[in-house]
Amino acid sequence: MNFDEIIDRRGTHSQKWDMMEPNYGVPADDGIPMWVADMDFRPPDCVTQALRRMTDHGIYGYYGDDTGYRAAIRWWMETRHGWRIEPDWIFTTHGLVNGTAMCVDAFTDPGDAVVLFTPVYHAFARVIKAAGREVRECPLNMADGHYEMDFEAYEAAMTGSERMLILC
């Protein structure tokens, strides 16, 4: 992978670059699009090759279960984190926002509060509010150029209605 290669993605239907001006009034030439986790470097060759093998087949129907996919996740969790997980614990969603919305719906009730340490990805608050839950913000402190949790402020902000905390 080459992290030094500059790839201009403007005008390529890139939400990150092409939606900055319509969404925020900032032309792509004048801003740094830090509002979405979308990378501007090419993926590893093995990923590109795997995708090409799939598209070369020429049929794009619904994708079924892939035991290799689940095995890779299980290997990663055990190797990197010492956590042995079962294949049926793995539930794939179509993106972070969908997965977050599903968790908010599954683990909280309307009116419950969900804690967010801010600044954080803006879509989390939108998902929480859309589900009829309350966003409980706990601002992070900026110290020596990095963010730190303020545990005293966190404890002071809690009212007892919180049922979920999202760390990002």
Model-derived features with residue positions:
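Conserved core of the PLP fold type I
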Residues: 60-168
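N-terminal small-domain helix-loop-helix segment of the aminotransferase-like
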Residues: 2-95, 102
